[in-house]
Amino acid sequence: MILYPSVDDLLERVDSRYSLIMLASKRAHQLDEGQPELLDKYTSQKNVGKALEEVVAGDVIIDPNEKDL
């Protein structure tokens, strides 16, 4: 169960749960591939949790021009 960031906080950053899952999944894959972390400190040790923390911080957003999401 995810306690931080809360689902309510995350949904303030994206328009739907589907978009949130797709965004977090894509960012987690980027972290798996060695992309640099965007925050100085994370609560989570797992890449999916780190991706969600980046979303709630506003560092990861949906690009409306990208077709993969």
From Swiss-Prot:
Pfam families: RNA_pol_Rpb6
Keywords associated with the record: DNA-directed RNA polymerase, Nucleotidyltransferase, Transcription, Transferase
Presence of keyword Zinc: no
Single GO term (MF): DNA-directed RNA polymerase activity
Classification via InterPro entries: DNA-dir_RNA_pol_omega (IPR003716), Pol_omega/Rpo6/RPB6 (IPR006110), RPB6/omega-like_sf (IPR036161)
Catalysed reaction equations from the record: RNA(n) + a ribonucleoside 5'-triphosphate = RNA(n+1) + diphosphate
Keyword RNA-binding: no
GO biological process: DNA-templated transcription
Gene Ontology CC annotations of this record: DNA-directed RNA polymerase complex
Enzyme class: transferase
EC number(s) given by UniProt: 2.7.7.6
Entry's family note: Belongs to the RNA polymerase subunit omega family.
Quaternary assembly: The RNAP catalytic core consists of 2 alpha, 1 beta, 1 beta' and 1 omega subunit. When a sigma factor is associated with the core the holoenzyme is formed, which can initiate transcription.
Functional note: Promotes RNA polymerase assembly. Latches the N- and C-terminal regions of the beta' subunit thereby facilitating its interaction with the beta and alpha subunits.
Name the UniProt record assigns to this protein: DNA-directed RNA polymerase subunit omega
Organism of origin: Pediococcus pentosaceus (strain ATCC 25745 / CCUG 21536 / LMG 10740 / 183-1w)
